[in-house]
Amino acid sequence: MIPLNRHGPGILLRKLKRWFEPDLDPQRVIDVFDEFDRARGYADWQALCRARLGRALPDGADHAPIVEQGYTTLPVMSAGTAAELLQAVGQDQEVARLKRDSAKLEGYQLDDPGLVSRLLDASLNPAVDAQALSFFRSEYLVHWYTLSRTAPSREPASVSFRWHCDKGPQSHLKLLVYLNDYDEHGGGTSYLDLAGSTAVSRTGYMFARGQRRTESLEELAAIAGTELKAYDHHPRAGDAVLFQPARVLHSGITPTRGPRYVLTLCLLPSPVPWREALALGMQIDLRTDPLWHEDARLLEKRLASTTG
C-alpha cells in the first residue's frame, strides 16, 4: 500500500505509467539516466565533488575491478565481528518494515547512532575505500543504510530476485555486507559484468516493470543474442560485494536453509569524507524519505547550511 503523504501521488503516478511500458525499450535506459544525471543534477553534483577531492587516487584506479568489471567481492570483517554486530542489532528488536513503499523489505531498525557507526566503520574498510575512491574519483557519503532479513523460501522473495538494474544515477554504488554464512542460509547474489550487462542493455530490457523481469540467465542471453556468464556469490559471514547497481545486472539468490542477514549501504559522491557527511546528517531514512533527491544540486546548499 502506498502511504498517504505528500509523496504518495507522485509514486502512484509513476507506478501507473509503468503498467503501460513495453517489455523491451532501448530508449528507456537513455531516459532513466537522463532523468537522474541531467534533470535531477547528479552529474553536476559528481563534478562538484570531484573538484573538491583533497587526496590522491589509489594506484591503478582506472583499472580497479569496480571500474572495469562493475563489481568486486572482498572480505570486510571477520565472521566473529559479523556475528557480534548482528547480535547487537537484533537484541530486543522485532523484524520490521524498512522502506516506506515496500512491504517486502524487512529487517532491523538502525536508530542507534553508536551502533550505526560501528557497522559503517567495520564495513567501509581501507579496501572498500580504495575501490569507492577509484570509482567516484571523489569522496563519498552513505546515502542510506539498511539491515535486512530475508526468510528462506522456495520462491523468489521479491522482484529483486530476478535479473534487474536499480534505477538511479549512473554514479552510485551499493555495498552488500553479509552478516551470516552461506552455509546457514544458501542465499547470495548473482552478477553480470559490465560487458554482459551492456549487451543486455542494448535490447531495452533494463528498468522494465518488476513483473517483466526474468529469473533465467538463459532467457536473458536469448534476449541479448549472446552468451552470458554470471558470477554467483556464495558469501561467508563478513564478506561483501561492492557494485554499480544502475549498470550491472544482478539477481538475488533466494535463501533456502535459513534467514539471510545483509547490511546494505548506498554510496553517493561527496565533497567531504563519509564520516563527516554522516555526522552532518546527509543520509536519508528509507522509512520516511523519497529514495532519490529531486535536485541533487541542492545538496551543496544543504551541506553549507549544516556547516555554517
PLM features: residue spans?
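Non-heme Fe(II)-dependent double-stranded beta-helix
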Residues: P3-R6, G10, K15-F161
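Non-heme Fe(II)/2-oxoglutarate
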Residues: I2-L4, P9-G10, L16, L242, ...
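Conserved hydrophobic/aromatic beta-strand scaffold that supports enzyme active sites
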Residues: Y71-T73, K174-Y178, A230-D232, A240-L242, ...
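Histidine-centered catalytic micro-motifs
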Residues: S160-K167, R247-V248, G252
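Double-stranded beta-helix
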Residues: H185-V248
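Short edge-strand/loop segments of extracellular domains
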Residues: A151, L192-A199, L267-P271
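Short, conserved beta-strand element in jelly-roll/cupin
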Residues: G168-E184, C266-S270
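A short secondary-structure junction signal
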Residues: W144, P156-F161, L173-K174, H185-D193, ...
